[in-house]
Amino acid sequence: MDDPREGVVLLDVPPGADGEFDRAALERMGHPVHMCHGPPLGTVCPLLDERGCPLFSQAHGIVFQLDLRRSHHQAILRRYQELARRDVPIRVVVSPTDAERYADLLRDVEVWTHEPTAADLDGFAARVEAADRVRDEDQ
């Protein structure tokens, strides 16, 4: 990729999780990865308090693995859906139970009810690349 910001993926993983498999797979496919563990306890995500988030603003795709049982994580996902360009693929990793419980919130994103496999991440990377190509052609 010519532009180092091209194809950047934002990987949201729970605090304590390293997301190394996802990061390594996406980087092997040519996508720089920015990791976010969500806001530290007692703080507000900059996306929710209108400061904006540089990790989000550079993202050409988002893999969201934060805990939807936490209201501020739900708010972050809603904010992604509100602010992301229509062509930015968003994938959410949840349990089958949470997929049902939060079906309304997850309606406009693709849901993985298992840990992403290399094939899942490859398909996601292809969507990011396709969106980048279309965006480049439109400019």
Each model region followed by its residue ranges:
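Non-catalytic signal-transmission and effector/linker regions of two-component phosphorelay proteins
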Residues: 1-31, 36-57, 81-83, 110, ...
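A structural micro-motif
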Residues: 31, 88-89
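Conserved phosphotransfer microenvironments
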Residues: 42-86, 97-101
